[in-house]
């Protein structure tokens, strides 16, 4: 019988042996192949044993010897000890989809044939931020970004670190509502004023404006990108109205306020005709 040792995933050349008192030429042949590996062709008294991928533990095979006079030996056993080797973890690419301005979690997939506990590390993204907790990464797109982004990650068993894999993130567009701007204007009593309405939108520059709450102390003309405010006759003081902006994708802003100051004007006194009899 023989014994040998090799490391996991490493082939070993085994030299079989036998004795013959007549010193005949001997021919070696395999009787039973190993359960957890494979054998190459027998060459003289040697054979190459290759353990199965990632296997470690004990394995055996048997052989016999035939001499020049066709005498056959007993069956001998070769016991192989395959020592464990720490295997590098492996990781898988992945993909995830989220809406604009919305964070998304993605599970990082990795495996280790040794069953070791794994820790994960993530790289940076061009158009967002990435954090990791356990095997879960959280991707947060930059404000108003939409399109394709990606980041890489690795897994470590505490000794060996995997190659990088890539998570591809698709960020779908969401219509951002416009922001109507508050406005302050001044006019004088009994004098109309033209007011330019305005709004901002990260995606759009064309808006439709609509008045919501009308002024208490004046009137508005037709609302477009501008509107004419006419104070009531002889009114002076403060007045307000509100409006909204709608973008080309039908997104409607919250209400904005136009604050109007109507300054007083000294009015000419008026007199009345009269008559008298004496």
Which ranges hold each PLM region?
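Short strand-edge motifs at loop-to-beta-strand transitions and within beta-strands
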Residues: 45-49, 135-139, 193, 225-229
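Conserved structural position at the C-terminal beta-strand
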Residues: 65-67, 155, 245-247
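Extracellular ectodomain surface segments
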Residues: 1-33, 52, 87-125, 142, ...
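A structural signal for beta-strand boundary/capping segments at domain termini and interdomain linkers
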Residues: 25, 58, 71-75, 117, ...
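C-terminal edge beta-strand
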Residues: 3, 70-85, 95, 160-174, ...
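Low-complexity "stalk/linker" and mucin-like segments enriched in Ser/Thr/Pro/Ala/Gly
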Residues: 30-45, 121-135, 211-225
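Surface-exposed, short loops/turns at beta-strand junctions within beta-sandwich domains
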Residues: 53-57, 143-147, 233-237
């Amino acid at each position: 019988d023989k014994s040998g040792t090799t490391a996991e995933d490493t082939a070993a050349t085994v030299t079989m042996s036998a004795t013959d008192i007549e010193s005949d030429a001997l021919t070696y042949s395999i009787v039973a192949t190993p359960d957890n590996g494979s054998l190459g062709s027998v060459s003289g008294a040697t054979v190459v044993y290759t353990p199965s991928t990632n296997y470690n533990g004990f394995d055996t095979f048997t052989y016999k010897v035939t001499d020049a006079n066709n005498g056959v030996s007993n069956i001998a056993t070769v016991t192989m000890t395959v020592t464990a080797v720490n295997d590098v973890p492996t990781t898988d690419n992945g993909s995830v989809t989220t809406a604009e301005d919305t964070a998304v979690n993605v599970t990082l997939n990795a495996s280790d044939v040794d069953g070791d506990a794994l820790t994960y590390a993530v790289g940076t993204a061009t158009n967002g931020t990435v954090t990791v907790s356990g095997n879960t990464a959280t991707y947060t797109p930059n404000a108003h970004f939409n399109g394709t982004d990606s980041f890489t990650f690795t897994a470590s068993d505490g000794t060996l670190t995997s190659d990088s894999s890539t998570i591809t993130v698709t960020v779908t567009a969401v219509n951002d509502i416009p922001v109507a701007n508050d406005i302050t204007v001044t006019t004088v009593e009994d004098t109309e004023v033209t007011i330019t309405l305005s709004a901002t939108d990260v995606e759009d520059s064309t808006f439709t404006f609509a008045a919501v709450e009308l002024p208490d102390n004046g009137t508005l003309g037709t609302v477009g990108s501008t509107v004419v405010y006419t104070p009531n006759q002889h009114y002076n003081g403060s007045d307000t109205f509100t409006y909204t902006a709608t973008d080309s994708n039908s997104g409607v802003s919250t209400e904005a306020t136009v604050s109007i100051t109507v300054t007083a004007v000294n009015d000419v006194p008026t007199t009345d005709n009269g008559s008298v009899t004496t």
